Amino acid sequence: MAKHDVTVMTLLLVVCALHVFDAQGTDVKLNDGFLRSGIMNIPFQRRVSPKYGHNFVGKRSGFQSPVSPSDYFIPDELNDEDESPNMDTYALFRELLGEYPSSELSDDDVIRPYPVVPWAWDRFENKRFSKENEKRGSPGFSHSFVGKRMDLSALEKELIAKLKAADLLSPLETEAPGKRRLPSYGHSFLGKRMPVDVFPRAIPSYSHNFVGKRSGNGENYFDDLDTFGDISQRADLGFTHSFVGKRGNTDFSRNPLARLSQVQNRAIPNFVHKFVGKRSVHNIVKRSSPFYGHNFVGKRDFEDASEGLDEEEGDIDGYSDDLDVKRVPGYSHSFVGKRIPGYSHSFVGKRTPGYSHSFVGKRVPGYSHSFVGKRVPGYSHSFVGKRVPGYSHSFVGKRVPGYSHSFVGKRVPGYSHSFVGKRTPGYSHSFVGKRAPGYSHSFVGKRTPGYSHSFVGKRAPGYSHSFVGKRAPGYSHSFVGKRAPGYSHSFVGKRVPGYSHSFVGKRAPGYSHSFVGKRVPGYSHSFVGKRAPGYSHSFVGKRELGEDEINFLKEVDAADISRQLAEEDEKEAMVSVDDKETLSNEEDASEDDFEKRELNFQHAFVGKKDEEGDMGVEMEEEMESEKGQPGYGNAFLGKRQPSYGHSFVGKRQPGYSHSFVGKRVPSFGHSFVGKRQPSYTHAFVGKRDPGFNHAFVGKRQPSFGHSFVGKRQPSFTHAFVGKRQPSFGHSFVGKRSGAEDIDNTFTDNFVVKGSDPLEDVLDFYSDSQLIGQPAAANEEELQQEAAEESENQTGTKQLDDKSNVPASSLGDDLPSPVSLSKQEDAEDSHIMATSST
């Protein structure tokens, strides 16, 4: 390629010189100077919206772009017309691209087996204007289409016969409207400037999500991409597609970032989804330009993709059943690395993704995240980071919203995260019920997703999506990072918490996310304080609030919360060294301070829970006789990963699940669709559960996964990130009453002696979870104090140390193995664990 690069640079110098002396040479004929007249005059449209990936749902036929790239220079009529383009010119172009020396090509070779496609011109153009293009920024995403797409083949075939190279190279403004072949729908685009390449009409970047059987020539541009250039060199552009159904994901083993250096040299523009934000990916030549591909859901065969090809072209340059998809540029949902791909299910880091995808329904959503079919998708994704994605997620039924994240119902909200129900909110993340909250993410339907995802990074709000219905999710995910609220989560049952996730104690959140039931909260998604509390309890089943909780919630207000946050931060800063040493004999002062904070969250219980259960004595006895991994609970994050639990808080990424925080995000995403909805979360849909979901990165993977509910569980799910992964997952659904069941799960988990990560967790859980006693520095102290205070369920001794707080705020100030820092942890450490009671 070095030789060809030199050749290209030499040509560019010559062309530039010609352009300087003959800038007005627009009348030069194609065969004696088309480079000057055509390429040099390529217009750059300012402020052109980026294309948003076409998402197709349902059987698709016809052309992906009005004219299939493989047909641009293939019309048979060209061979017989006097006005045929000069073949020497094409040979020159092919040689510039390093395909073959012109001396080795005949006219036929150039025209049919190796058609000059827009991608080739883009590559050539990028070599000439790469620096300028980087400054201008490229289009971001293309459109989303749902249902059978309008077939323009009749019009296109008519145009193809009349196409001349001059038409394709002429400035955009001089072309007839019928020849532009720009994407039909381009809702809402963001981007500084989009360079209009030689073939502006064929720009649709990838990232199409397809759901259902797809066939037709829409697949042709994939084919040409692989035929263009050496197949082995194109491998770097191919990342998994994420297929659900007959075709499984085939490229999960690829490292999206490993080949970026090679990709940037290849300089093939418009394969990526540009990102939206102050710093957006401008071109594939930039390091930060991941490109994604499509998500396919449903039955999808290669035979379907090749239906529109002639037999003569069916095997063009290695086209085969198992070849093209692997090398299609773009990978789908999740990625890992400093530069995160622009979308997909949930990523958090320096560069967060812009959106997610896939839409389904008879009516196309104008712009939204994705979701599917009569059975609502099993999850929603929310991502947060320094650069938060612009949109949220949506859910769909027979009728998808016309704009906005896709909403479903007779009345679609004007803009919001989508919701389901006869009446959706007019603005806001969608709510369901007779009276929906004014702003929140909850989703509801007969078949609702099994969980919600909320992710938070250094500076970003975390949303949570909760879903509820007859089939309610077993849990929700909320994660919190250095500076971000983690919230929301869903409550289900006849009685929904009246205020704010139902958290009680000094640091109760001002609002909560989504609630479902006869009584929905009036305002959700709202957080108070620079650092919003992070918690996420999800309850499913009949649940009554305690008297103390109700009284506290009636009295609390935003001002109190803000003031209490400041007071608690000051108190935490005053912790004595002696107290720190008590927490851990193995850690230094700074680490002890880190350990000082108690975890913010409690478990999420599903089903009717017996509030009277006393677990102290039973738990102690079990711990002495049982050893094993935790059965469930909330996962926690910190230097020492708790063995189980839901929410995580700390500098280090959460050990599991859909939400990832930090520089490294999970490598894959999810989102699956099918007739049957998954019984577990992170939801994958289909008759068969995915074998590997939610991939995550870390030295150690969790032994099970997020805890899924259903007859069949995925073999590996919700992966986790961090050196120490939770051994199980969290959140379970089913009737769990009485302390005995809970005791068993705890005792199985925390009596593994010699396991450093579990010692502090043992301390925390014996205290904050159910007993409310101070955390012990080690297992021996824990057992001693457990015996002494096992009957003290109210934890009054601990509460007195801080201030008068409702008895329901057990474990409010318990030491925790996890914390963010002296100052940043203070906000989260006091989140009430009592909502689980």
From Swiss-Prot:
Tissue specificity remark: High expression in gut and CNS.
Record-listed Pyrrolidone carboxylic acid (Glu) modification sites: 598
Keyword annotations: Amidation, Cleavage on pair of basic residues, Neuropeptide, Pyrrolidone carboxylic acid, Secreted, Signal
Compartment list: Secreted
Biological process per Gene Ontology, one example term: neuropeptide signaling pathway
Leucine amide sites (modified residues): 190, 637
Signal peptide: 1-25
Cellular component, GO annotation: extracellular region
Name this polypeptide is given: Enterin neuropeptides
Record organism: Aplysia californica (California sea hare)
